[in-house]
Amino acid sequence: MLQQRTIKTLTRAVGVGLHSGQRVELTLRPAQPDTGIVFRRVDLPEPVDIPITATAVVDTRMASTIGAGGAKVHTVEHLMSACAGLGLDNLYIDITAEEVPILDGSSASFVFLLQSAGVELQNAPKRFIRVKRPVEVREGTGQQLKWARLEPYHGFKLRFDIDFAHPAVDSTGQSAEFDLGEGNYARDIARARTFGFTKDVEMLRSSGLALGGGLDNAIVMDDYKVLNADGLRYDAEFARHKILDAMGDLYLVGKPLLAAYSAFRSGHAMNNLLLRELLAHEDAWEIVTFENERQAPAGFTQPVRAW
């Protein structure tokens, strides 16, 4: 039987929110089978649980925000991406503020925390959402066109194409692909950082966003080049970060997907719209388990190796 996974022991991190700039403490705790991933706002007078679901997403401006019972947690996508990459099904995430810490702008620190806590197999079948037919969402036309698509696939793979007219992006590639069954999430995707442009920072900060952003937790570019002294971590790091984000956004459906995802200029809003479009058509998906691990898709049977 392909089993569900949680972590063996609790682990903690402290950082600041990318947009809020607030100090935040994060505690990741093991959870029982079939719990799912649950964020808990422990800073409120009465703690509020926010289980992840596609419909728990309440805002997608600049990040994915989930909410329940009047409480919200912003910028969940990097931590959720790490959970997806490591195949974790059940986890409690206690948080002392309204935004997940940005740490280094990638999911690498979350991967390190979770792997350090250890991955524990649980006596319950791992449940997948298997996509049975193509589902697509589109927006705009011509140069404004953007789209995202899910198609049937015995595994989980992603392709993302971006379109930034910038020398640094052009020189490293505008597309990236990742197959969970062939690649290694920790090595190939997790270290890709969020990115932004200096010309946008003042506008964002005047709107109360990017207050915790800087060269230590993002790739920052002027009109011509990357400003970070250490340069880029990957070829096509920009497109790889979009894959990192998409993995986190898609994992908000609450179960791992068996599908091929492809997208052009998509973002948090379109990724969530794609999930809602999928769930709205019951003929497009089904819940499956694998009693025989040999029949399970590659990439889900063994814990992800470290770097």
Curated annotation (Swiss-Prot):
What's one GO MF term for it?
Answer: UDP-3-O-acyl-N-acetylglucosamine deacetylase activity
Mind listing the UniProt keywords for this protein, alphabetically? Hydrolase, Lipid A biosynthesis, Lipid biosynthesis, Lipid metabolism, Metal-binding, Zinc
Gene3D superfamilies for the chain? lpxc deacetylase, domain 1, lpxc deacetylase, domain 2
Instruction: Give the reactions, separated by semicolons, that this protein catalyses.
Output: a UDP-3-O-[(3R)-3-hydroxyacyl]-N-acetyl-alpha-D-glucosamine + H2O = a UDP-3-O-[(3R)-3-hydroxyacyl]-alpha-D-glucosamine + acetate
The UniProt annotation places Zn(2+) binding at: 78, 241, 245
- Protein's pathway: Glycolipid biosynthesis; lipid IV(A) biosynthesis; lipid IV(A) from (3R)-3-hydroxytetradecanoyl-[acyl-carrier-protein] and UDP-N-acetyl-alpha-D-glucosamine: step 2/6
What broad class of enzyme is this? hydrolase
Q: InterPro entries recorded for this chain?
A: Ribosomal_Su5_D2-typ_SF (IPR020568), UDP-acyl_GlcNac_deAcase (IPR004463), UDP-acyl_GlcNac_deAcase_C (IPR011334), UDP-acyl_N-AcGlcN_deAcase_N (IPR015870)
- EC number(s)? 3.5.1.108
One annotated GO biological process: lipid A biosynthetic process
- GO CC annotations on file: membrane
Which residues are catalytic? 268 (proton donor)
> Which family, according to UniProt?
Belongs to the LpxC family.
Its biological purpose is as follows: Catalyzes the hydrolysis of UDP-3-O-myristoyl-N-acetylglucosamine to form UDP-3-O-myristoylglucosamine and acetate, the committed step in lipid A biosynthesis.
Protein name as catalogued: UDP-3-O-acyl-N-acetylglucosamine deacetylase
Q: Which organism is it from?
A: Acidovorax ebreus (strain TPSY)
Q: Lineage of the source organism?
A: Bacteria, Pseudomonadati, Pseudomonadota, Betaproteobacteria, Burkholderiales
What gene is it encoded by?
lpxC
